[in-house]
């Protein structure tokens, strides 16, 4: 396995930002600031801890650091005496409150950091960049927009931006990624510094250029990207703006320096310092009692859960550490090292391991409990094979893992193979094949001696994400057989809403160890696993195998408690894994020349649309700029602002807003079409040729089996599930998908499968009869809604829209918008539909109630989707029967209302996913006797490439197999088409 775990999360907290928000949130409230009966201020302590608890609960970080400002001046104050000179004097009660907060954080053993001469932002910036380089996913909790400049998808850094009152909502923050920053600021994260350099920042007394405001700064950066390029192109800028820029260059450069966060502060901390290692209850509880924060005393077990690296709660009075807190890190001062009693530690690994790299030699400090055997001689391999032959009990399968130098199985070299067959320290082995140093066995010897174990089904195996290992081994001439358990898929079936990487599974099942991610190895950009010494790679791979072996028994035991889920895993998901591996290997041909022509056509169309939009607006502007577009729509054209929402830089122009504005002005249709075509061009037409494999001349999409909570497959590299089909251009993209030369491309598509499933689940008489009699169900609906037998194509289309829309909870307004009728007419149609299909709506409501009462709903075959509601009134209804529930007086938040809509739809969508997966498993057996190969699965459609001579015989067999995949109360119908490309086969 090239990368065995998701990156651990490093949470960085802007201490003063959160503390001040807590202080003013309560200080400005009607009840005033919080105080104890003795008069001690506690607004900061209460608000800070409450918010931090919520973030820890939702984000579950592996490490945390909290940065604070110091009182003395920083290098920015020395460079500019006016810097932050407008800040008010810190209130006395805030300082006192903050001192108690520091004590609480020390009692919780959380690392607080300051550094002389630098601000908290610089500490956060340094830790964020260093954390990213060390393999962490980084999230920064702050209400300071300055930190937006650190956001980076490449570095895996985002900001949890505090809301105006972070103590009045469920989470108190909005997570902003790259696009989130653009939406909020109108510029990219990389442009934040130059944005402030141009227009300044009054809150920090950063001057910027006199006469240049935010709008002008955004416009300049949209056109020239950076401050440096603005000045490089100064000759092209005319009038007063050029004069302001010319006169203000020194101010701009000075402001740029003030605004830029330092990312190389020499902090005296290690990653070990930032791990969540537990805390002393004896120290924390008296402090909480003194501050009269009794609500937190009642939640002491939650504190242990959130601040102890997900370790089991420690009983009060029997602590897991020595009671000594981590000290606040300050510049130029030594820090006392805390070494908790090893015998009391509940985890072998807490977070990221220590990685040493000196003179090119990389080693990892791993526990002595794992002692992998490094197999480098034929005699050692023969002895290992003899040992492995003893393990034929499927209840105790041998765990396997591969190590490669690439994530792409088509090009990856097999660097090593690992296995674990017991819980003893030395019942782990690593077989190196292609490291750059050390004695190793050849691939030929491995195939001769180990091949009989790997390929023979009598030797049961367990793997984490077996599809990857299967493909890697296959490309090296080694068959993988006898996989009785895939831990990733088992976790997915049991808990589809959770993550399923090895690190998270180790934590969730309390293995007492945490698998390492590839980034934990400390390899440089040009290095791979092959650069590791054999012992180091053996430790890394061995830990993966050992963890997988331990997980197997725990997952099998849990599966035994849920027979229907076990059957889904054994009969659907695990057989499908092998099928998907073959589909990924096969790939599909792409017509690159055609896509180049289509790209040129799209470019011309986009230019035409832009010209039309400029004419409608009366001026040219950047259609891709939310800020500029908002100005045109709501300021110049005067469109209804109530249909949008206020953002930091103006009004939202997202897709939902534009849909609401459709019909209000012709420019809206132009903008929507422009966005659709631009996305098609960038995401598919221009991107697909770049993904063609040089050796196979095909694209090899990845089918993701353990991602969606509904049970559906997803795909990536490229994402073929999202190719739209409504527009002419989107349909033309499918023309680029080709079969093997002189073969046919065949499409087998389930017709109206979700409506048929709805008919089966709801037992709605109208739908049952319509499908049973092979009638046009959309026509039937239209006839019932309009009260007449003869309907027009437009009326049938209205019936189709409402039939499919009701599955996804479509309301009257959206129905009216999509069909072009008035809101009043839309409401009348929806009401009429409710009366006509009463049993459908009874069923949908029952599913919502089941989700509340049981916490989950199920598909036809028993797949579960779980729902965790936030609204307390809903949570209190858990455990009751459906007939006992009454939601009339229940007030719920927007997210829970959305969850209920998903609960109504989940059995339908999930059953659809189950049916096509069952069909794929059955078809794979059918196709063993033919040359035809399954290539793609997209929604309810399967794509094959087929020799023309097999069409007459095989097409009916494929159709029948799919239609008989699962027996419903109504017939399943599959439509078969063939052609020389995908578009022709639709």
UniProtKB/Swiss-Prot annotation:
Segments for region (Disordered): 308-327
Keywords: DNA damage, DNA repair, DNA replication, DNA-binding, DNA-directed DNA polymerase, Exonuclease, Hydrolase, Nuclease, Nucleotidyltransferase, Transferase
One Pfam short name: 5_3_exonuc_N
Domain 5'-3' exonuclease: 1-303
Gene3D superfamilies assigned to the protein according to its UniProt record, in alphabetical order: 3.30.70.370, 5' to 3' exonuclease, C-terminal subdomain, 5'-nuclease, Ribonuclease H-like superfamily/Ribonuclease H, Taq DNA Polymerase, Chain T, domain 4
A molecular-function term among this protein's GO annotations: DNA-directed DNA polymerase activity
Organism domain of life: Bacteria
Matches recorded under CDD domains: DNA_pol_A_pol_I_C (cd08637), DNA_polA_I_Ecoli_like_exo (cd06139), H3TH_53EXO (cd09898), PIN_53EXO (cd09859)
Recorded catalytic activity of this chain's protein: DNA(n) + a 2'-deoxyribonucleoside 5'-triphosphate = DNA(n+1) + diphosphate
Biological process according to GO: DNA-templated DNA replication; double-strand break repair
Keyword RNA-binding set for record: no
Ranges where the 3'-5' exonuclease domain occurs: 304-592
Polymerase: annotated span: 593-986
Record EC number: 2.7.7.7
Subunit organization: Single-chain monomer with multiple functions.
Function per UniProt: In addition to polymerase activity, this DNA polymerase exhibits 3'-5' and 5'-3' exonuclease activity.
Family of the protein in this entry: Belongs to the DNA polymerase type-A family.
Protein name as catalogued: DNA polymerase I
Source organism (scientific name): Synechocystis sp. (strain ATCC 27184 / PCC 6803 / Kazusa)
